A protein has these predicted regions:
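Metalloprotease/metallohydrolase-associated module, dominated by Zn2+-dependent proteases
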Residues: 29-33, 37-42, 156-190, 206-260
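Disordered inhibitory propeptide/activation segment of secreted metzincin zinc metalloprotease zymogens
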Residues: 2, 21-101, 168-170, 259
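Short, solvent-exposed loop/turn elements at domain surfaces
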Residues: 94-102, 145-148, 224-226
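N-terminal secretory signal peptides that target proteins for export/translocation
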Residues: 1-7
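Tryptophan (W) side chains
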Residues: 7-9, 13
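Divalent metal-coordination and catalytic microenvironments
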Residues: 117, 197-200, 216, 236
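Metzincin-family zinc-dependent endopeptidase catalytic domain
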Residues: 104-198, 206-209
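Bacterial N-terminal signal peptides
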Residues: 13-23
């Protein structure tokens, strides 16, 4: 048992942060390529002026035993994928020493999870403005949600997707907007496993695996999964190769012919 005051000993926290940093693959610094569009519209507003949307792709049929593509769901505009994602992570806030330590531990765990997705093939640019990001990671508990029994339930993490129409200098495209909430109050491994799972959703894995050894398992196993499994990576590779209208230029609805 650690001696009294051990958890408040600065050397312990320095060691913990250093260990997380060593385990964390590099993630790019804030990128000037992440800029907010001039305007974001709801898809309902876009529907009045845009050419009709092609039917969404059907869910994938079961592939080999090496992935779980058939458990993913596409959006009305296709599979949710981008060649590069702008990600904003809530920075460490000003506060007392204990709060600052908790925030740093949270940030280190999120950075580690983010780095593992980068190593698995996700291209990430760091945004220093949340409005410039497609993925925003917040240090807070997710909003309560009704469970199957109708009762409100709390959770440690959640990712929520919304599709919008983005416009800049006459160009328009469908842009995913993902809010990710990761609660504090977990150990470093619990934080990292939660962040890994929710970021997997954010990067397009909108579905769950039936294997507790996968980061995207519907029901976690006894040991936290701290990096994507080979099945997670295989499913991600399949997703990234699928066609999608998300991020591609949109055609405007043709103007009516004169006199009609």
């Amino acid at each position: 048992m650690p001696p009294r005051g051990f958890w408040g000993w600065p050397g312990f926290w320095a060691t913990a942060f250093a260990a997380l940093a060593l385990a964390m693959p590099s993630v790019a610094a804030p990128s000037p390529g992440c800029r907010p569009p001039d305007e974001r519209l709801t898809l309902e507003a876009l529907a009045a002026e845009q050419a009709p949307v092609a039917p969404p792709p059907p869910p994938a049929s079961a592939g080999s035993l090496g992935d779980y593509r058939h458990r993913l769901s596409p959006s009305p505009y296709g599979w949710v994928r981008l060649p590069s994602w702008c990600v904003w992570v809530e920075p460490v806030a000003d506060g007392d020493e204990a709060s600052h330590r908790r925030d740093r531990l949270w940030l280190a765990a999120v950075q580690a999870a983010l780095g593992h997705w980068v190593r698995s093939g996700v291209v990430v640019q760091r945004a220093d403005d949340p409005q410039a990001a497609q993925v925003r990671v917040w240090r807070r508990r997710p909003p309560l949600r009704h469970g199957p029994d109708g009762r409100l339930r709390a959770s440690h993490g959640r990712a929520q997707l919304r599709l919008v129409a983005a416009r800049t200098q006459g160009r328009q495209w469908i842009e995913p907007q993902v809010e990710v909430w990761i609660a504090q109050g977990q150990g470093s491994q619990g934080l990292q496993a939660t962040a890994l799972h929710e970021l997997g959703h954010a990067f397009g894995l909108w579905g769950h695996s039936d294997d507790p050894g996968d980061a995207m398992a519907a029901v976690p196993g006894a040991q936290p999964v701290l990096e994507p499994s080979e099945r997670d990576r295989a499913t991600l590779r399949w997703l990234q190769a699928q066609p999608s209208r998300i991020g591609e230029p949109l055609e405007e609805r043709p103007a009516p012919a004169p006199g009609r």
